[in-house]
Amino acid sequence: MATRVVVGTQWGDEGKGKYIDMLAKDSDMVVRFSGGNNAGHTIVANGVKYALHLIPSGILNEGKTCIIGNGVVVDPAVLLKEIKELNEKGISTDRLLISDRAHVIMPYHKLLDELQEKFRGENSIGTTKRGIGPCYSDKTERSGIRMCDLVDEDEFVRKVRENLKVKNLIIEKVYGGQKLDEEQVISEYLEYGRKLKEYVADVNSIIFEAIEQGKNILFEGAQATFLDLDFGTYPYVTSSNPVAGGVCTGAGVGPVFINEVYGVLKAYTSRVGAGPFPTEQNNEIGDRIRELGWEYGTTTGRPRRCGWLDLVMIKYAARVNGLTALAINHVDTIGKLPKIKLCVAYKKNGQETRNFPCSLKELAQCEPVYEEFDGWDEDISNVKSFDDLPDNAKKYLSRIEEIVGVKIKLIGVGKEREQTIVVN
């Protein structure tokens, strides 16, 4: 049995989907354990581009059981759209399952998300306005609606009527918005429930049964360490726990059953939306990285902020997630720059540190300490082994391993999943 977890080590968009898709080939089951459709995986397989926001990337591998775990919040309309688009491209969703414990994103969640962000004004946190945060808030408040409720029509109607009494008051009286039509919400969502009923199951039992049978299971992370509600750059974070520990609560799997944890990173750093970014290059270098790496959000289309790779962050991510391996992307991209910088420490009040601070005020006082490397402006897209990489690339990658203290096992040298070096 092998149970692997794949997590992002930065602010998301590291290219996790590519490695999840690759590792899924050796897995019997792929499980998504956190987040919602505010995250997106883009995979290019056999020349076809797939953008997935809820369904596990493993769906592209025939015969794999793909599970949306209880830690995920589900927008039924988005999920049904993804199912339809996959089916139209010849991809079967017969082996897709959704946890009966997963919470449902309702129209009032999306409306409140938008109204709250508008209310914050210049203090906005850059939410995607897809209702993720308000849905998780209801989950914590114990007023949420779960998939088991969505497919139980009487229970669903009761809960919606109860919730809308409060939600419509908040929408109207606090934010000055227009209240939602109760009957329209009920009618729309009952239809979603009927269409999704065949996919809803007690997936926790199914996962545990697979573990007992010695099956290979891949746990697919969305977003990343520095967007984690507890360990990220709070409050510029998501509303869930995308770190490896999120598997335990988001899929109902005890830590003793986790064998390997892969941390995915880019050879540089990017971020969407507001929040701190110590190595950001708000200049021609940042613009060049953005264009070379085509750094625009899968979900929002927003241009990403770009900068140098920050190993203080990666080392912190290695500790928080218990990483056993690194998987690095865009090695081909960063090498096109003549000079490359690598942040190996921070300097604060004249003192060097390799610890990532909790306080954003303290983080703002930290200056990156850089080491400089020469680029390798040559085509490496067909390189199949570490030894065949340019010397400058090998120096760069070896320094990353040395400082982080975790071996690089997968190296991305292009967009296709075949353009990956597996390091033994």
Curated annotation (Swiss-Prot):
Its EC top class is ligase
Q: What are the record's GO terms for cellular component?
A: cytoplasm
Cofactor binding annotation: Binds 1 Mg(2+) ion per subunit.
What EC number(s) has UniProt assigned to this enzyme? 6.3.4.4
Q: Biological process (GO) annotations?
A: 'de novo' AMP biosynthetic process; IMP metabolic process
GO molecular function per UniProt? adenylosuccinate synthase activity; GTP binding; magnesium ion binding
Q: Where in the cell is it found?
A: Cytoplasm
Under the heading Pfam families, the entry gives: Adenylsucc_synt
**Positions of Mg(2+) binding:** D13, G40
Q: Where does IMP bind?
A: D13, E14, G15, K16, N38, A39, G40, H41, T128, R142, Q223, T238, R302
**Active site: which residues?**
D13, H41
Which Gene3D superfamilies does this entry report, sorted A to Z? Adenylosuccinate Synthetase, subunit A, domain 1, Adenylosuccinate Synthetase, subunit A, domain 2, Adenylosuccinate Synthetase, subunit A, domain 3
Q: Which pathway does the protein contribute to?
A: Purine metabolism; AMP biosynthesis via de novo pathway; AMP from IMP: step 1/2
Q: What is its main location?
A: cytoplasm
Give the catalysed reaction(s), semicolon-separated: IMP + L-aspartate + GTP = N(6)-(1,2-dicarboxyethyl)-AMP + GDP + phosphate + 2 H(+)
Q: Where does substrate bind?
A: T298, T299, T300, G301, R302, P303, R304
**Does Cell membrane count among this protein's keywords?**
no
SUPFAM superfamilies assigned: P-loop containing nucleoside triphosphate hydrolases
CDD domains for this protein: AdSS (cd03108)
- According to its UniProt record, which cofactors does this protein need? Mg(2+)
Extract the PROSITE patterns matched here.
ADENYLOSUCCIN_SYN_1, ADENYLOSUCCIN_SYN_2
Tell me the function of this protein: Plays an important role in the de novo pathway of purine nucleotide biosynthesis. Catalyzes the first committed step in the biosynthesis of AMP from IMP.
Q: How does it assemble?
A: Homodimer.
The protein's name is Adenylosuccinate synthetase
- The gene designation is purA
